[in-house]
Structure formats: structure tokens, C-alpha cells
């Protein structure tokens, strides 16, 4: 017998394979979005380390940063001139002025100082009196113009200076804040606020 059109069997006549919907239906664009490549002032791409990976952030720092930290340990300081700092931020090699000229990696005390130290050292065979010991101590500790220490007393390196060294004179906010701007360290907050106020007044004056 021939089935009538529109019967109950016709409703169960589903397709066996359902085609995948088009990309345009599934997502907004057919094109894949490329990650924006960061480029420097001359157009070369800047390789940024993976900030989400804590081990890379801890152990794999860029060479420039490592060198800058070494410079700070040696006693070099980033240029205090704001314009010079900006310019050095663009260059590959940071322009740093040496604060501590006497500091060297393999520096030995001068010959005169060594001689004085050797002459003041007392052997065990001699049993000096308290007065003699005091005299020797005073000669050792007395500051003399002829004896200059090879390494002058190191100052405590401030966190600001380390930040400056790590980013060539600029303090970079942490990556978690998603702040791409570089804030110069030298400018205090009060000065910034004054500048903001001046700018507001200027804008208000122009608009009115």
C-alpha cells in the first residue's frame, strides 16, 4: 500500500549526518586574530617574555636588565637628566654615569695600605701590654690622608634605584596591572599633581 503524504512516518525521516555549521555562524569572524607584535621606535619587533610563567619571570631575565643590575652593583647610576634618561631608554646600551670611580671587580688594596697592615699585625710570641694593643688599634683605625681605601663605603641601594636599573631609568608597573606606560622615578607625586592642575586650568581656559 502506498503511504499517504503527511503521515506519521514522514516526521521520523531525519538526515543521518548533520553538516557542521559555517564558521561565520559559529564565530564572529572567519579570520584568526594575530597577537599584536610590539615594535620599538625603529620598527623592529620587541620579544616580550611570557609574563604568566613565574619560572621564566624569576630566572630568565633579558640581558639588558642583568647588565643594568650589574652596573648598580658596581656603583653606576642612571643619568638624572630626564631627557637623557628618555634617550637612553631608546638605545640598546644604557648611558650610565659612574658614581663610584674607585670600585673595580678585581681590586686589591694599595701597596702602602698592605704594608701598614702587615707592620701592625702582632705575632703570638710577643706578649704586648694593653697600652701597646690600644696604640696599635688606634693606628689601624686612624683615618690618614695618605691611605685611601680601595673600595669606599657602599651606600644602601634603594629600591627605586634598582627599579631604575631594571628598566633603564624608568619604573615599570607590574604586568598584573596591565599598565603599558612608563613612569619616570625622578618626578615626585606633588609635582605630578601640580602639573595636572595646571593642565586642567589650561584646558578650562581654552574651552571657556
UniProtKB/Swiss-Prot annotation:
GO term, biological process aspect, one: meiotic cell cycle
Keyword NADP: no
InterPro entries in the record: DUF2406
Residues in the signal sequence: none
UniProt KW keywords: Meiosis
Residue ranges of the region described as Disordered: 77-114
Tree of life domain: Eukaryota
Summary of the function given for this chain in its UniProt record: Has a role in meiosis.
Protein name: Meiotically up-regulated gene 9 protein
Amino acid at each position: 500500500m502506498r503511504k499517504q503524504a503527511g503521515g506519521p512516518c514522514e516526521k521520523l525521516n531525519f538526515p543521518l549526518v548533520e553538516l557542521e555549521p559555517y564558521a561565520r555562524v559559529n564565530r564572529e569572524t572567519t579570520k584568526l586574530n594575530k597577537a599584536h607584535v610590539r615594535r620599538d621606535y625603529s620598527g623592529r619587533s620587541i620579544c616580550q617574555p611570557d609574563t604568566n610563567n613565574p619560572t621564566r619571570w624569576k630566572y630568565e631575565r633579558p640581558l639588558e636588565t642583568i647588565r643594568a643590575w650589574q652596573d648598580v652593583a658596581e656603583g653606576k647610576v642612571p643619568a638624572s637628566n630626564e631627557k637623557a634618561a628618555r634617550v637612553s631608554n631608546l638605545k640598546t646600551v644604557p648611558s650610565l654615569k659612574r658614581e663610584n670611580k674607585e670600585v673595580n671587580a678585581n681590586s686589591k688594596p694599595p701597596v702602602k695600605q698592605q704594608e701598614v697592615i702587615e707592620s701592625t699585625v702582632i705575632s703570638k710570641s710577643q706578649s704586648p701590654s694593653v697600652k701597646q694593643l690600644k696604640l696599635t688599634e688606634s693606628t689601624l683605625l686612624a683615618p690618614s690622608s695618605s691611605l685611601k681605601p680601595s673600595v669606599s663605603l657602599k651606600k644602601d641601594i634603594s629600591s627605586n634605584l634598582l627599579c631604575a636599573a631594571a628598566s633603564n631609568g624608568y619604573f615599570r608597573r607590574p604586568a598584573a596591572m596591565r599598565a603599558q606606560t612608563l613612569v619616570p622615578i625622578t618626578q615626585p607625586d606633588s609635582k605630578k599633581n601640580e602639573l595636572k592642575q595646571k593642565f586642567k586650568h589650561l584646558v578650562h581656559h581654552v574651552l571657556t
